[in-house]
Amino acid sequence: MQVTVETLEGLERRLNITVPAANIEDAVTAELRNIAKNRRFDGFRKGKVPMKMVAKMYGKAVRQDILGEVMQRHFIEAIIKEKINPAGAPTFAPVENKEGSDLVFNATFEVYPEVELKGLENITVEKPAVEVKDADVEEMIETLRKQQATWTEVEEAAEAGKRVSIDFVGSIDGEEFEGGKAENFPLEMGAGRMIPGFEDGIEGKTKGMEFEIDVTFPEDYHAENLKGKAAKFAIKVNKVEARQLPELNDEFVAKFGVAEGGIDALKAEVRKNMERELKQAVKNRIKEQAIDGLVKENEIDVPAALIDQEINVLRQQAAQRFGGNVEAAMQLPRELFEEQAKRRVVVGLLLGEVIKAHELKVDEEKVKAIITEMATAYEDPTEVVTYYEQNEQMMNNMRNVALEEQAIDAIIAKAQVSEKEVSFNELMNQPA
């Protein structure tokens, strides 16, 4: 076998491979003999059919199969010999494959980029310095009360904190538009669900009032046909309601699975959950900054084949989120996923290089700690831990998580790390 390597554009490579004719002919002959020996032919005893007849009937098909197998096998031998690491499946193209002549073919493919980590010391990470305070717990309790609240109709004007039921019809230049009409629409005043100016126009109005308001859709509104458009809404207030918060008593506490200890026990449980969420949020914020810095300091070429694979993964995930229609999801335009897919590939390649450069191995104690921490969010943590320990696939997933965390720790160890005091709400409400 003769092999030459061509470097094409970017990460693309081409192997030109020559396989001696004897190798092909020997393989074809062996397969034809196998057919002659094991298949039945009318008029002949098994294994007694003439080879010329077998070759005439099956020779062309067998040769095609053998050529495919030979190209695949010799491609693998060639990349091992040349120490090449393909990033995707090759495209084979026969150049010369006449019977009796050497097989000459090429294989075109992409390789993984050569990554030499740099700039880890330039990465800046601002670690949130934050704790759950009593006021945060009280605010969360109030949020729980609001979630359990009931609404009672009142003869009062609409204002922040009240809820109104309205009919409305929207129009632009005198023409109604799609999605601009509703009846008995519940709107909590002050929640900021509607476009700017909509709630302001309702404030102060009472049951039975009919009126019109003028608003302008934001330039970044999700509906393309409404961006920046001036609109008029005809509105009728059907009723105004006030929120009735539940009392902080044993009945309220019981709704959250706290059987004993009253409101103090609920507060303790709420604090524990908030501290667990806070710990994860701090970890995520640090990880996000470390990865952002890693990507910024290390620009690399990305194999298109890996991006295509990741796009398909994202499409399948989209299908799972939206009803499981994989076929429909696979038809979604690649542009929807391309940027995210490329980012994920880049991050994966760079973290892989961090793991390699620092010779990181999975820390099984860290794996156990991650599972134990995660299990605390469930009613029976011991059962969750046991479930993971008995499921090898789940354990392997957790090992990957642990190894990624070890890679992040290695980045942080070389980065410029500072602390910044923030409140619980500031951290938890930061945009992703």
From Swiss-Prot:
Location in the cell: Cytoplasm
Principal location: cytoplasm
PPIase FKBP-type domain span: 161-246
Pfam families, per database record: FKBP_C (PF00254), Trigger_C (PF05698), Trigger_N (PF05697)
GO annotation (BP), single: chaperone-mediated protein folding
Listed EC numbers: 5.2.1.8
Record-level GO cellular component terms: cytoplasm
Reactions listed under catalytic activity: [protein]-peptidylproline (omega=180) = [protein]-peptidylproline (omega=0)
Residues annotated as transmembrane: none
Keywords: Cell cycle, Cell division, Chaperone, Cytoplasm, Isomerase, Rotamase
Alphabetized GO MF terms: peptidyl-prolyl cis-trans isomerase activity; protein folding chaperone; ribosome binding
InterPro entries (alphabetical): PPIase_dom_sf, PPIase_FKBP_dom, Trig_fac, Trigger_fac_C, Trigger_fac_C_sf, Trigger_fac_ribosome-bd_bac, Trigger_fac_ribosome-bd_sf, Trigger_fact/SurA_dom_sf
Function of the protein: Involved in protein export. Acts as a chaperone by maintaining the newly synthesized protein in an open conformation. Functions as a peptidyl-prolyl cis-trans isomerase.
Domain comment, as recorded: Consists of 3 domains; the N-terminus binds the ribosome, the middle domain has PPIase activity, while the C-terminus has intrinsic chaperone activity on its own.
Similarity comment: family membership: Belongs to the FKBP-type PPIase family. Tig subfamily.
Protein name: Trigger factor
Organism: Vibrio vulnificus (strain YJ016)
